[in-house]
């Protein structure tokens, strides 16, 4: 018999196989696409703001996004694995030292800004596209290589003749 935790973990794996959820943390500016049904029509409404909290509770995980709209602070809490979430996009990463940024509720203007976190890239990103190697693709490369060797060899001969 499966426990509730095992069932929740299976559901999380199933949801993650269907849609990709990016890594984001409190302080990051994110754009959440929310699926809204009005009558028979479905549309996507975007909510962009600063992630001020994230709760990791298996299938019950959620996050709170805060934005300032027409001078008023608006906060919205979303279920991380909910069906209403269409997309989550990280706009920029914020540099903070707290897990919950509830202190931003009391601040406005410049004091509510969060510095951008600069992430160092480790390693070299190489985009390799496999191509079929055939005689047709090798012929132009071989011809150019022969021309370069001929051009390099000729000036050396001329210089040696001039010295004599």
From Swiss-Prot:
Residues 144-164 are annotated as: Disordered. Keywords: Ribonucleoprotein, Ribosomal protein. GO terms for molecular function: structural constituent of ribosome. GO terms for biological process: translation. The keyword DNA damage does not apply. It comes from the Bacteria. GO terms for cellular component: cytosolic large ribosomal subunit. InterPro entries: Ribosomal_bL19, Ribosomal_bL19_CS, Ribosomal_bL19_sf, Translation_prot_SH3-like_sf. Transmembrane segments: none annotated. Pfam families: Ribosomal_L19. Belongs to the bacterial ribosomal protein bL19 family. This protein is located at the 30S-50S ribosomal subunit interface and may play a role in the structure and function of the aminoacyl-tRNA binding site. HAMAP family: Ribosomal_bL19. PANTHER family: LARGE RIBOSOMAL SUBUNIT PROTEIN BL19M (PTHR15680:SF9), RIBOSOMAL PROTEIN L19 (PTHR15680). This is Large ribosomal subunit protein bL19. It comes from Pelagibacter ubique (strain HTCC1062).
